[in-house]
């Protein structure tokens, strides 16, 4: 082994295996691009994103950690969400929850 070397497991890795999923149509009604990171509480994203927010409560994007999805002005796309895991408490973001989900 070489210091810092990464040896990936053979085969494919399934993200969020077995997690319940919600698919939502999301559109950017604003005039600026909006980028949402992998672990951002989707319910609390920028108000210019139009979607069913109640279905997104307690959810995050079903994408690899450290990545993001970008919504260009006027763009609509489907996104797949999975539940936030762990203690199921949300603090910060836009301060709309500040506690238990």
Curated annotation (Swiss-Prot):
Main localisation: cytoplasm
UniProt entry keywords in alphabetical sequence: Cytoplasm, Hydrolase
Signal peptide residue numbers: none
GO terms for cellular component: urease complex
GO molecular function: urease activity
Biological process annotations from GO: urea catabolic process
Top-rank taxon: Bacteria
Recorded catalytic activity of this chain's protein: urea + 2 H2O + H(+) = hydrogencarbonate + 2 NH4(+)
Keyword Hydrolase part of the UniProt annotation: yes
Pathway where it operates: Nitrogen metabolism; urea degradation; CO(2) and NH(3) from urea (urease route): step 1/1
Annotated localization: Cytoplasm
EC number: 3.5.1.5
Family label: Belongs to the urease beta subunit family.
Subunit structure: Heterotrimer of UreA (gamma), UreB (beta) and UreC (alpha) subunits. Three heterotrimers associate to form the active enzyme.
Protein name from the UniProt record: Urease subunit beta
Originating species: Chelativorans sp. (strain BNC1)
Designated gene of the protein: ureB
């Amino acid at each position: 082994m070489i210091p810092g070397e990464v040896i990936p497991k053979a085969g494919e890795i399934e993200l969020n295996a077995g997690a319940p999923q919600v698919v939502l149509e999301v559109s950017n009604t604003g005039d600026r691009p909006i980028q949402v990171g992998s672990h951002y509480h989707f319910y609390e994203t920028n108000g210019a994103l139009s979607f069913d927010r109640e279905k997104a409560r307690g959810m995050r994007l079903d994408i690899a950690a450290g990545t993001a999805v970008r919504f260009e002005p006027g763009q609509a796309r489907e996104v797949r969400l999975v539940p936030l895991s762990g203690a199921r408490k949300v603090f910060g973001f836009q301060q709309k929850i500040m506690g238990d989900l």
